[in-house]
Amino acid sequence: MLYIYYLFKSLFFHTLFVFSIYKDCPYMRASSPETTSAVKCPFNKTAVEGTHNKDWWPNQLRVDLLHQHSNKSNPLGETFDYAKEFQKLDYAALKRDLHALMTDSQDWWPADFGHYGGLFIRMAWHSAGTYRIGDGRGGAGRGQQRFAPLNSWPDNVSLDKARRLLWPIKKKYGQQISWADLIVLSGNVALESMGFKTFGFAGGRVDTWEPDQDVYWGRETTWLGGDVRYGAVSEGVHHPDEHRGAKEKAAKNSDSRVLENPLAAVQMGLIYVNPEGPDGRPDPLASARDIRETFARMAMNDEETVALIAGGHTFGKTHGAAPADNVGPEPEAGELEQQGLGWHNRFGSGKAGDTITSGLEVTWTKTPTQWSNDFFEHLFGYEWELTKSPAGAYQWVAKNAAATIPHAHDPSKKLLPMMLTSDLALRFDPIYEKISRHFHAHPDQFADVFARAWFKLMHRDMGPRVRYLGPEVPVEELIWQDPVPKVSHVLVDAQDLLALKQKISASGLGISQLVSTAWASASTFRGSDKRGGANGGRLCLAPQSQWEVNQPQQLSVVLETLRRVQTEFNAQAGDKRISLADLIVLAGGVGVEQAAKRAGIVVEVPFVPGRTDALQEQTDVSSFAPLEPFADGFRNYVKGDEVVPSEHLLIDRAQLLTLTAPEMTVLIGGLRVLGANVGGVKHGVFTDRLGTLSNDFFINLLDMGTEWAPVSKERHVFEGRDRRTGVLKWTGTRVDLVFGSNALLRALAEFYAAVDAQEKFVRDFVAAWSKVMHLDRFDLV
C-alpha cells in the first residue's frame, strides 16, 4: 500500500481541524454580503447582525466543536433508529426506481447521452472522495454534500442538480433511506445500469442535519487556491502567530509540492487533483506525482488509483461549453428564488450541450453509457497534443484521429477523442503505465480491481462490517475493514468477572498501569471513520505496541501479566473464555474501582464482554499508522515539538472520541489523579493522593493561593507557586491550565471542585470512562 508511514511522519493530521480557530481561516469569516435584508427588517438589532465572541476573539478555544449534531438540529428525535427503518425498506423497489431514473431525462436538466449514469457516479464519488485517512474525516457517511462548504465547492458544480433529480425518490422512501446512503447507492445503480457488475453495497450511513465544523479543509481564502497547503510553514500545523507571512513563505516553496497534512486535495474546493495538471500546468508526469500523493492519503494504492481513474472515466463526460464568467454564484451565495440551486449558467440554454461545470470538454470513450475497455484503447491507441476547451481549459486531443466520439445531445455529431492531463498521467508515469497496460491486456482484472476499489471508496469511512446493512453486503472480509474474529467461545458471566477482578487485583499491577493500558487500547477510536478502539486487542500488535505514547516497556509488562491471568482462566474445562482485548478493558475498570474505593465511594464500572483478539495478519500496519496520536492531552502527551497549542489538540482528540465538554473535563480530572500521564510525568497531577479518584485536580487548579507562570518562552509548561511564600507546589501543561483559563471549561471545573461534587465527579468519570471503553462496540447498538 502506498500510504506509507513517511507520509504521516509528523502525524499532525489528527489535529488539523483546529485551524478553524485562526483568523486567517476562510471559515472564520462569513461570506454573506455586507447588506442583507436583515438590515431593513422591522425587527432590527437582532443577534444575527451583531458582533459575536469570535469576532472579538478569533483564537478562542473551539469547545463548541464538542457539541455538534445535537438533537436540537435533528427532527427525527432521540428514539429514531435508522437501522430499524432501513430494514423496513423495499430495497428491490428502490433499486428499480433508481434504474428507471437513469434514463428518465428531465427537460430542466437533460441527461447526457440520454443517461444520468455519469452524473450520479460523479455525485457518489465526490461524496465519498472527501475522506482522508489522516484523521478519518470527510467521506460519504453523513450526507455532508448537502451542506456548505461541500455543496458549493467548485468541484461539485452541477451536483446540486443530481440531488434534485434524486429528490422524488428520497421523498417516496422517506426516512427508510438516508440521503447519505441514497447518494452512494445511486452511484452503484448507475454503474450497474451501464453494464458493470459492482462488488456490493452496504447501507448504514446516518444523516446529519447541519455542516460538520470539525473538518479542516485548508486555509486558502479563494476557491481553487493552493498557495498555503503546499510549502507551508510546517506540515499543516502552526501556532497562530506563525500565520503571519505563511502565504508568502508558501509561495516561495510551492514547487516542493509537500502537501499539508491531513489534506488530500491539491486545491481548495477540489476533491482530488487539478485535472489540467498541478496549478493548471499541463504536465502529465507532474500530475502523476499529485495523483499518487492524494490517492495515497485517500488510502488507495497505485493499482486502485489507476482502476478508479480509468473506470470512472469510462462513463460520461466533462462540461466546458463556454468560459466560466457565464456562471453565477454557488448555491450558498444564491438568491432565494434559486431555491438552493447554484451556478446559474447564462450561456445559451444553460444546460445540455451548453453546460459549464469544470470548464473541460472531454468524453473519454465511444460508449459513455456502457462499461468497456475503451479508456485504455484510446489512452494507448493515440498520440496526444495539447489543446484548449471552449472554456479555455487545458486538455488533450488525439492526433490524426477520426471523429468517433458521440455528442452528448446531438446524435448527428461526432467528436474527436479527448483526454485530461490527469488521464495521460496513467500513460507517462512508469508505474501507472505498467498497471494501465496490464489492465488494457486483462480487462477482467481491470473490472475486478475497479469494483473492489469503488466499494472501498464508497465504504472506507463506515468502520467495521458489523455496521453494514442490506442484502448486498459482500461476504468477503477485506483487510481495510480492520477485521476482528467472530466470538467463538462462551462469554464470561458475572461470577467469572468477579473472579477475574480478584486475580487482576492480586496480580501486582498498580492502578496507573491498569488505567493507562486500558486507555491506550480504547482511545484510538475515531468517531470520524469508526476505526480504532479496544475490540481486536490491537494494542498488543504492531504498530500500536511500539507507539511512544503507549510506553512500550511498561506495556509489555502489563500485557505479560494479563496474559498469565487469561491463560489460567482459559485453561478451565468447558468453552468459556476471555479475550485479551476484554481483559485489558476489564483490568482498567478494576483500576478505576480501586481508585474510587480509596475515595470512599463504591462503584461498579460497566463492562460488556464480547471483544475478540485480532491477528497480526488481520492488521495492515501502514493503514493503522495514522491512528497514532501526535498528541493525547488525556495522558499529557505531545510527540516532538508543540507546534499547535496543546489545548486545541485536546479538543481535536476529544471530538474524535465523540466526547462532550463535561465528559472531556471529568476524564482529564480523573486521569490526572490516577497517574495516567505518559512517562509518569507530574504535570497536572494536582494531588498528594495519587491513585485516589478524587476531585483534587479541580480543587487545586482553582486555588487562588497558587500563582502560575510559564517556565520558558515557549509557554508549554507552567509552575504553580504559593502566592505568599513562592514555594513550588505544582507543574502543569497548557492542557491542565486551560481548565482554569477558558471560561467554558472553568465553569465545568468549578462544578467538579465544589465541596458536594466528589461523588458526582466519580460517577460522571465512570460513565465517561465506560463510554470510551465501549465506543467501538457497534455489536451492542
Curated annotation (Swiss-Prot):
Signal sequence range: 1-20
UniProt keywords, alphabetically: Heme, Hydrogen peroxide, Iron, Metal-binding, Oxidoreductase, Peroxidase, Signal
Active site: 126 (proton acceptor)
Essential cofactor(s): heme b
GO cellular component term of the entry, any: cytosol
Region span, Disordered: 237-256, 317-336
Site location (Transition state stabilizer): 122
Binding annotation for heme b: 313
Record field: catalytic activity: H2O2 + AH2 = A + 2 H2O; 2 H2O2 = O2 + 2 H2O
Keyword DNA-binding: no
EC number: 1.11.1.21
Pfam families in the record: peroxidase (PF00141)
Quaternary structure annotation from Swiss-Prot or TrEMBL: Homodimer or homotetramer.
Protein name: Catalase-peroxidase
Organism field: Xylella fastidiosa (strain 9a5c)
